[in-house]
Amino acid sequence: PLSLQLNAEANSAAFIAIAEALGKIAGGLHASNAAAELVENAVNSISNMERNDSIGTHAFAKAAFWLHNGGWEDTRFINKLAALFPEQSTINKRMIAFAMGRYRGPWYTDTLQVNRFLNSLQQEPDTLCIVAAMPVAGRTESALAAEYISKQLSNSDSNTELLVSACRASGKNAGVSAQKIEPLLQHKHLSVVLEACAALSGKQLNSEEINRVKQSMNSLPVAAQAAVVRMLHGQGDTLDVKVWISKIDQNLQPYERLACIRALGATGKSAAICFEQALKNPDILQANAYTEAFIEAHNQKDLEFSDTYASALIALMDRGDIGITALCAAEIRSANLTNEEKTNCNEVLNKHLNNLSLPKEVETANEIIKTINAIGKESRDEIKVAFNHPIDWEFVKSIPRKQRAQILTSKGIIEIELHVEEAPGSVASFIQLCKEGFYDGKSFHRVVPNFVIQGGCPRGDGMGGTDYTLRSEFRLHDYRTGSVGLASSGPDTESCQWFITHIPTPHLEGRYTIFAHVTEGMDIVDQIQIGDTIQRIVMLDQ
């Protein structure tokens, strides 16, 4: 057993791998409330780790990361991590910071321990350490934490990752005032503006602050204006529906319009307008956005459809679009429906499930199955994708070991190196799609600051794929800054969509195939926003 092997392992890499595996197993089992005895054995093995050098610290931090990721709240790990932090190498500090940032237990009420760690963090020069540890400051009521976050927010010249993480922490920390966040609405980087809007949504603004935000609203990028609409709604200040519809009707870029449509759900009495457009709009991405806005408007207590909500969701599913069907299926699970309405929905869901094309539409299929299981008397297993796309090994043999590719985007060039030996099937598919021109003109439809940019969807909303799926190819690569991975909705569902990480994302490891890494152009990755395009992707001669 791994628990017995840990302290006996002399090889450093193997020692770290065993500790991480124990953390993953224990964290995963704890999250699903399973095998309590096995969890305790793994936890005890990690706690009693005998190796106390740099390798031992890194191994302990990795194991603790996965335990905390699974919801482990015992304070013995975070106390040790906080004590270890000050004297470690930068690489160990980063791992400790990521592990502490995943913790969500009672330790945050221990002001003495929290402040001791924050005092160490104030001396830390490494930006990535600070970004990874910033959630700690957001989750405590310590006055020192509020002061630390406010200090980070006040330096508008800080890098984007730091400001984004500080905004997120400020939204959760009641001690950080709206006055500290508001100036960032005028920041030059859209990601910072959007995160500032989200942070302000959790604050109570006074009338002067609200008026100031409204007056400056038209000077903001359109996506930021949409975020401000949501933020103002949270303050009880709802814009007139007609005013916002006039914004949607302006000459906007496609993804700007989608952002405005989604915000329509937060403008007041908009359910009827959103439903009509969701049902009839010929642009399927706009129809999906109107569906999201309709659901939000209804859940914001727009009573227009209080007696006919189930029928409205059924009508939208009958458009036959996989995106709208998935949205409505998820909403049916949480909606307050009568037994008769559940029966009607169940019949419609089964009808649409039978009409889906597999494996291409497996994500929608499994969303429907979750809802059928939740509202009916059936209990179905989610669909597991069968092997359907053999690797062309002759083609793989023709790919140079360190094949590089240039991704030409509307913001500039990103160069990547492909991992053909570690992910042959994924790399072969990617190259073939590039040579076919599949990615030409596709958009980056998803950007999450301090996480990923994602593109390559043929629909443009994340619901599209190829007619085949790929086998997952998990290897021992870490998800670092600039890792290129394949998007999926579960094992062996990878297709054509890919993402690039802004910063290390250890929680993705073992869950998403890494098939490349960025060698040049991370500054371009950081500039990409939703709606920017992939012009083409070319393979470079070796």
Please describe what each predicted stretch is:
Residues L22, A26, L38, E50, ...:
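A charged, solvent-exposed segment within the mature domains of Sec-exported extracytoplasmic proteins
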Residues I273, Q277, N281-L285, E292, ...:
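Cyclophilin-like peptidyl-prolyl cis-trans isomerases
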Residues P1-N7, G28-E50, W72-P86, P106-Q122, ...:
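Amphipathic alpha-helical scaffolding segments comprising HEAT/armadillo-like alpha-solenoid repeats
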Residues Q88, P125, S158, K188, ...:
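Single, functionally critical "micro-switch" positions that shape active/binding sites
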Residues F98, Q179, A428:
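Short, contiguous clusters of charged residues that form electrostatic/catalytic patches at enzyme active sites
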Residues P1-L4, A13-N33, D53-E73, I91-Y108, ...:
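Structural detector for internal amphipathic alpha-helices that build alpha-solenoid repeat scaffolds
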Residues A10, S89, P125-D126, D157, ...:
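Residue-level recognition of short, well-ordered coil/turn positions
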Residues A8, N48, E87-I91, Q123-T127, ...:
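Short, mixed-charge aromatic SLiMs
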